[in-house]
Amino acid sequence: MAKTDFLTADMTRRQFMKISGKSLAGLTLSASMLSLFGCSQKQVDSGAVATWALPQGLLVVNADLCTGCQRCEINCTLTNDGVCSSYISRVKIQRCLNLDGAGNGLLSGNDNCFVYFPDTCRQCEDPACGNACPQKAITTNEQGIRVVDTDKCIGCGACHEACPWHMPTVNPETGKSSKCIACGACVAGCPSGALSIVDWDAVTSAAQAAYMDL
């Protein structure tokens, strides 16, 4: 795939939303944006770097820095559920372990080695999870985040099945579905820097710096 000149001119939040949850492979980032994301162009080219558009900024994932320690999952569930549980975590690492050799649906592995890639909700503009919910329990809050109304949720799992990435997860203890609410707990729990959130002002400044350097 031919590279696209990326972030060397105006880059809007809407444009980032179009590539939210996708690898940046095939895109050429400016030096200022590479510095902001804490990655190299080589890592971008390899598909190791992806971004998620959140209300507070960009969630940047660098798979090359992920050790698979699962602390992001632990911090997520401790913060939101008061328990340690990879299964109900809103950020997914445990399913990337490739224990059965089946892959994770995102990356096929490298020389039969494990490939760790933190994955989470894309906050889709037209969410399949919400559309599939028979109780209309998944709505959009004032920040633009898709949230589950646990009073309406019946734990049927329709949201999980409808999501192309199977992100919503029904808690077997509560019988309620949960999904990412962009709280940032996963980032706070990451010891390796594989997860980071870059605020929108910094993204805008880096894009403007790239434009000025042309």
Cite the ranges covered by each PLM segment:
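N-terminal secretory signal peptides
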Residues: 1-15
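N-terminal export leaders
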Residues: 11-37
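Primarily the internal scaffold of c-type cytochrome electron-transfer domains
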Residues: 198-214
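Iron-sulfur cluster-binding cysteine motifs and their immediate structural context
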Residues: 42-44, 71-93, 126-154, 158-178, ...
